[in-house]
Amino acid sequence: EPNLDFQFGKYIHIKFMLSNWNFIDKEIESLKNKIINGERVATPFSILSLIDSPNLHRITAKKFVEKQYPTSNSLGPIIKGPSNKKIRIGYYSADFRNHPVANQIINLLEKHNKSKFEIFAFSFGKKTNDEMQKKILNIVDKFVEVSSKNDLEIAKISRELKIDIAIDLMGFTQGNRHQVFAEKCAPIQVSYLGYSGTTESDSIDYIIADKTLIPEESQKHFSEKIIYLPNSFMVGNINKKVSDKIFTREELGFPKEGFIYCCFNQNYKINPKIFKIWMKILNNVKSSYLWLSKSS
């Protein structure tokens, strides 16, 4: 059913995951034209890696959120009660486990000033009990397991816990619960880290970024107000131990001599134009090799 909402972009995205580039230029050109014509042809996540156009990202997100996540008033306006002694910050994610997002925010959670802030983690994902999840459980003031709750229930729980600032770590990535924010789970709602594009949602007030991620000239393509962090918006995990094991070229399947180029991104981020450039480099550098991650 190629004419189903948002499916054409998903189809092209899957082709990139398989490194199937047959007719890809023609299909992407068709995708661009369909977006410009106002058709619902792609999800915001799929379009980020397919087309380098903040304006088309914005148009796609707007079409998507209007259809999938309409702003709701089911719980009514948030009634401001007595202020908490501490500001309550809620982080919302399905990835409080061994996952790149958790690895990025673990130090952030540790560095919050506990005399001024209370930290809540709302988990949409399964309980893994892995090392990272256990660390997060020990760091936050309250770990709220809500994977079995519906979106309205999660928003209601957030209000009952009087969350002041809700931080969505997912955007439109897999496993997201964006409708929680459409139900207005907190007075201030922020997008951070997991998704770098605009949501075009009335529900998200701010996005945290830096001027490399969102240059000032790109602000017009974002519905959110942009909070710029100095230098980098990414925190990183400074406590992560680096392996002290020394790997040999031979055990990894490489000859003793030669330069090894690496790209461990997922396949869908590699396009024919980039790959052609890589092949030119390999052609011009004697005894050079390209090491890719096998993801398909």
Could you say what each language-model-derived stretch is?
Residues 115-117, 160-163, 259-260, 284-290:
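Short, surface-exposed connector motifs at secondary-structure boundaries
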Residues 98-100, 269-271, 293:
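A generic structural signal for short coil/turn motifs at secondary-structure boundaries
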Residues 84-88, 255-262, 288-289:
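Charged active-site motifs of nucleotide-sugar-dependent glycosyltransferases
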Residues 108-115, 272-286:
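Short hydrophobic signal-anchor/transmembrane segments that target glycosyltransferases
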Residues 1-253, 266:
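Alpha-helical solenoid repeat scaffolds of the TPR/TPR-like class and their adjacent stem/linker regions
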Residues 103-105, 274-278, 290-294:
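Composition- and surface-driven signal marking solvent-exposed, interaction-prone regions
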